[in-house]
Amino acid sequence: WRAEYYKRRAQAIQNRIDHDLYKGSLVKRGSGTLVMTGNNSYTGGTTVEDGGLFGFSESFGSGTVNVNGGVFGILSSFDDNFTQKGLLNSLVGVARAPMQKANVVVNNGGTYAIVADQNVQVGSLTFNPGSHVAVISLTGNAFEKAYRGEDQVGTVTADSVKGFNENALVTPDYALVNHTVTLDGNTLTGVLSKGDKTLADYAANSNGVSVAKALSADPALLGALADATKDEVRKTLSSLANDIHVTANAMTVANGQSLARAIKDQAMGIDGAARVSDVDGGRARLWVSGLSNWSKMDRSGASKLKSDFYTGLIGLEADINANNKVGVFFGAGKTKFKGGHDGKIDSNDLHFGIYGQSKFEPVRLDYGFAYTHQDRDTNSSVFFKDQIFRASPSYNAKVAQIFGEAAYTGLNFGSVSIEPYAGLAWMHLSTDDFSNDIGGVKVSTKFESQNLAVSSLGARVKVPFEVGPAKLKAVADVNWTQYMGDTRGKAKLQSGALNAKIRSEKLSAVAAVGVGLEAQLSKRAALGVSYYGAYGGKIKSNGVGATFKLAF
């Protein structure tokens, strides 16, 4: 019975074939592009929902082509490099016998593509409300030629054209070439011509201009962007000009000042030198300190970069004599740099250094050396035209600084003392280079080292008081800090002929205020807490700290 069933089934199929009962249809889905070059006779119609569908006018059977989404276009010729058939040509207008021509209806969300350098014929061509028309190039070189000043023209001649003037919107908005489509009789003519804009015109800031000029100097990269839209060029420039790394370097310098301040504060005590005199017994002291600092720094044409800086420190100090002491410290923590859509950097930090204090009444000197090592992991994206690439480099940054401060301790008004001071620091920051693979192209970021001088002028006011048996001291601190030297983070973006300079905003003057409170817990123990806020034209920060000290 099975043999009989299959025999009858085969006969039924053959009968439908012999009497042309199979209609057949084509539905194009998915983001890819399909090119058809055969002379097809299916009658069930063609529907385009997504991606691209191109072919000869005779390739789409006798049914209607409905373009509901994606892009559809007719070709007069096609160089078949995929199946190695070479140059193929449409039979419409060439063959002696009349050939069927595609009847096309472009609906809301669909795009009809006029292919530059090709002149084609269709049956009817209808544009419904919400439809689009574009001039494109399947090879891409038409846009390069247009940008060089060679107009690129394509035409579509139809038996009838409906709804073009009323409904069709010419898209997309190309960045570097002008894009026009006109209707004359039943012929649509699309033209690509050189525009009056350059890549630099779409840059949001000086970093973007630098990237744009570098891209324009590389024929291959410029050619790749010749058919980019305005939004794609803006995204490309903004992405490649991302200053999150160099801004992180500038903020690391500012965080280094917070670290030095924490060391000096614990050395003298937030309340002055009271820890040495009030904490009895022993000339050596073990201390632990926690520091948190939250900062924001401006970025040209982008959202601010936020920095969350957390550090724990442990140190040991000893008196050399009544007027001199030295100490060492070690610490670890994290810094989180957050740049919104431009990405983030997570850093594991290590700190160590030495410090000292000397008194030459009525002058006190505080000085030291600090070194910070950052192990940074990045999570960001790079846009190039209509593509997106993940960029997650890991690299190291190092900061070394020598700092010193001279304070005058002779202004006492009863129990209240005023302590004017001046400070100076030298800082050196270096950062490892890294590279990203962007679509198979190696793009390197090479950092410039920074050498800075940091000066500060300020005054502290100290007021001791008692609450029951507890001894406390309150401190207020105001100062003005000035950064000098290499105050911008700088790097070079390099790949082939691409060589663009990326810079952060400038660290300049900062006004700061601090308040602190210290409590004597016992003869050997003291606890201090503090707040510090710094406010500059480009950077603002707020921080809190706590220090516990034990003499032995």
Q: How should these model regions be labeled?
A:
Residues L237, S300-S307, G340-G343, D375-N396, ...:
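Solvent-exposed, glycine/polar-rich loop segments of beta-barrel outer-membrane systems
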